[in-house]
Every structure is written in structure tokens, then in C-alpha cells.
């Protein structure tokens, strides 16, 4: 895959439930602490190395941001780092929180 794909929150949720992909959240630490998808890994410049070390490059990665815009650049970056399949989640955390309010965690 040379380009990331966009995915809606319902499809992202299904992939996560079926363990077909991992979810990363690239929002700032304060926003992440105020609420994030339960299974999201907080991906920052500081945690990128650990994420890459702990996740196989053939494991699909779904990238979440605020509204689905910033995640596109991060998704492309992860492809350039060698990940085979990367998705940008349309609507970002705001759409996730609206559609799956029971699956939002709080704190870092």
C-alpha cells in the first residue's frame, strides 16, 4: 500500500473489536487525557520508537486525531516508515466520542 486509506469510525471500531488493527491517537497530551478511545495508544514523537518496536509492520494501523485531518499526515508518515496498511479515521475522536461514548477512557 503506497497510500493510506480513510475509514469511518464504525469500520474502525469493528476492526478494533476483531483485533484486525491497532489504534493510535496523535492528539496532544491534554486532549488525550480529557478523553480517548479505550484501546488507543497515545502516539507522540516520544512514544513513536516504542510503538514501532512493539508493533509488527504488517499489523494494520488506524490513526485518530481531532477531526480526521491531522491523522492523514501521520498515516502517510507511518506508511513511509514501513507499515504495510494504514488508515486515517474520518471524523477523528469527535466522531468516535459521538458514536461510541461508552468506549471513551479518561486520563493519560
Swiss-Prot record:
GO terms for cellular component: cytoplasm. InterPro entries: GlpE_sulfurtransferase (IPR050229), Rhodanese-like_dom (IPR001763), Rhodanese-like_dom_sf (IPR036873), Thiosulf_sulfurTrfase (IPR023695). PROSITE patterns: RHODANESE_3. SUPFAM superfamilies: Rhodanese/Cell cycle control phosphatase. Its EC number is 2.8.1.1. One of its GO terms (molecular function) is thiosulfate-cyanide sulfurtransferase activity. It is found in: Cytoplasm. Keywords: Cytoplasm, Transferase. The active site is at 65 (cysteine persulfide intermediate). It catalyses: thiosulfate + hydrogen cyanide = thiocyanate + sulfite + 2 H(+); thiosulfate + [thioredoxin]-dithiol = [thioredoxin]-disulfide + hydrogen sulfide + sulfite + 2 H(+). Residues 17-105 form the Rhodanese domain. One of its GO terms (biological process) is glycerol metabolic process. Belongs to the GlpE family. This is Thiosulfate sulfurtransferase GlpE. It comes from Shigella boydii serotype 18 (strain CDC 3083-94 / BS512). The gene is glpE.
